[in-house]
Amino acid sequence: MGSLHDYVLIITGSASGIGLATATIALDEGARVLGVDISSPPRSLIDHSNFKFVEGNLSLEPTPRRVVEACVKAFGGRIDGLLNIAGVMDLNQSVDSLSDTMWESCIAINLTAPVKLMREVIPIMRQQKSGSIVNVASKAALSGAVSGVAYTASKHGLVGATKNVAWRFKQENIRCNAVCPGAVDGTSIHRGLETSQFDSEALGTMSLIHEAHMRDRERGIHIQPEDIARSLLFLVSSRSNGINGAIIPIDNAWSTI
């Protein structure tokens, strides 16, 4: 019997990258999973009897509520965990080159959607007097020298929301934590972005930091989606009771600089 046997989990971004790895491992460990993504998941998930899926854009107003309603309909009234993994990157734009579209997209997907999903699951978790929320932030949540202003602001905001939710509901056995990945192999956070449009001047100011971190990869030190997934599932499980309001880097010490 897996360590997540009969857990009911909502996992966003479940069609690829960290979200796919998290959903796959959770199912292997006995969880029941409601996956969410703007793209269709692979057949390996669709064919699993304990996996249900909502295809939708989390930035649209009805989607967070529709996701939670679908989970309740599929698995009953209990929701043990919410894993906010879905995210989008920016074009590394500084505040002086930032477009309204990029700002609104990053804030909508990376901050507003996770907050609205937390708003939808908290009443259920309060009623059952338990629950665990894990948000995927970023190294950019801990630094101003990783990405553009939109992505950086959205992930800093998610860390603030995580801490507030953790403190507010700690007496009701509801936990809320965040992880901050660095560079992760096999992720699709740049999906839909044209890299030729990146703010090259802003990227240049960060080049030394990025080059230092990339040397690890040249030496064969890679962080895989499964590495992040296992940390997320540890935090959502009872094995991490007592860990609440934590912001945990998973970046092979990148966060130390």
From Swiss-Prot:
- A Pfam match is adh_short
**Family matches, as SUPFAM superfamilies:** NAD(P)-binding Rossmann-fold domains
Which residues of this chain are annotated as glycosylation sites?
57, 92, 110
**Residues that coordinate or bind NADP(+):** 11, 119, 151, 155, 184
Q: Which keywords belong to this entry?
A: Glycoprotein, Membrane, NADP, Oxidoreductase, Transmembrane, Transmembrane helix
Give the pathway annotation: Secondary metabolite biosynthesis; terpenoid biosynthesis
Reactions listed under catalytic activity: asnovolin H + A = chermesin D + AH2
Q: Which CDD domains match?
A: SDR_c
**GO MF assignments:** oxidoreductase activity
How does a null allele present? Completely abolishes the production of novofumigatonin as well as asnovolin A.
Indicate the transmembrane segments per the record: 7-26
Gene Ontology terms: cellular component: membrane
Entry's EC annotation:
1.1.99.-
Predominantly, its location class is membrane
Q: Which domain of life is it from?
A: Eukaryota
The record's subcellular locations are: Membrane
Topology relative to the lipid bilayer, per the entry, is: Single-pass membrane protein
The cross-references to Gene3D superfamilies, in alphabetical order and at most eight, read: NAD(P)-binding Rossmann-like Domain (3.40.50.720)
User: What the protein does?
Assistant: Short chain dehydrogenase; part of the gene cluster that mediates the biosynthesis of novofumigatonin, a heavily oxygenated meroterpenoid containing a unique orthoester moiety. The first step of the pathway is the synthesis of 3,5-dimethylorsellinic acid (DMOA) by the polyketide synthase nvfA via condensation of one acetyl-CoA starter unit with 3 malonyl-CoA units and 2 methylations. DMOA is then converted to farnesyl-DMOA by the farnesyltransferase nvfB.
Family label = Belongs to the short-chain dehydrogenases/reductases (SDR) family.
Instruction: Name it.
Output: Asnovolin H dehydrogenase nvfC
> Source species, please?
Aspergillus novofumigatus (strain IBT 16806)
